[in-house]
């Protein structure tokens, strides 16, 4: 049975490994492991940055994602951004992300302080886009731009 819960610091090695695998698989990027470790640690050390959600099959960590926060002055609420999603290949197409998304949606609605959930996806990742659309997410309203340093 799959269990969805907030991650704890003991999950750090698996989350780092997931991030390295995800970047290579989806964007053909080889990330610097110590930098990713530092980034994951920063979230656990500063809850204001966000939190990690994980899925477990028994004691095995099978998926993780990170939630970061955006303040919406239009809604006077926080918007949760889903980032860094990874599901182990052998658990894909089994509804793991749907369970995680349902957990997040429930928590967000119940909080009264969250105005919505957003995510971004690489335009080339057609499989992920299909999953998000099947969950009722709308990818047509905004275009995402970035300037990274």
Indicate residue ranges for each PLM-predicted region:
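Hydrophobic adenine-recognition pocket in adenosine-nucleotide-binding enzymes
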Residues: 7, 85-87, 121
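Conserved acetyl-CoA pyrophosphate-binding loop and the N-cap/start of the following alpha-helix
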Residues: 91, 95-103
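Conserved active-site alpha-helix within GNAT-family acetyltransferase domains
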Residues: 98, 123-141
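Conserved GNAT acetyl-CoA-binding A-motif
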Residues: 109-120
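Terminal substrate-recognition subdomain of acyl/acetyltransferases
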Residues: 110, 134, 143-149
């Amino acid at each position: 049975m799959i269990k969805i819960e907030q991650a704890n610091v003991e999950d750090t090695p698996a989350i780092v490994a997931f991030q390295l695998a995800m970047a290579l698989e989806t964007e053909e990027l080889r990330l610097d492991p110590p930098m990713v470790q530092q980034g994951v640690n920063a979230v656990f050390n500063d809850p204001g940055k966000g939190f990690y959600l994980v899925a477990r099959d028994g004691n095995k960590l099978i998926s993780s994602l990170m939630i970061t926060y955006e303040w919406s002055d239009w809604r006077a609420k926080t918007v949760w951004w889903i980032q860094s999603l990874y599901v182990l290949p052998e658990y894909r197409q089994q509804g793991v992300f749907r369970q995680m998304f349902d957990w997040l949606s429930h928590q967000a609605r119940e909080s009264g302080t969250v105005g919505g959930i957003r995510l971004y996806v690489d335009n080339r990742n057609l499989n992920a886009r299909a999953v998000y659309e099947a969950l009722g997410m709308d990818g047509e309203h905004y275009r995402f731009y970035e300037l990274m340093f």
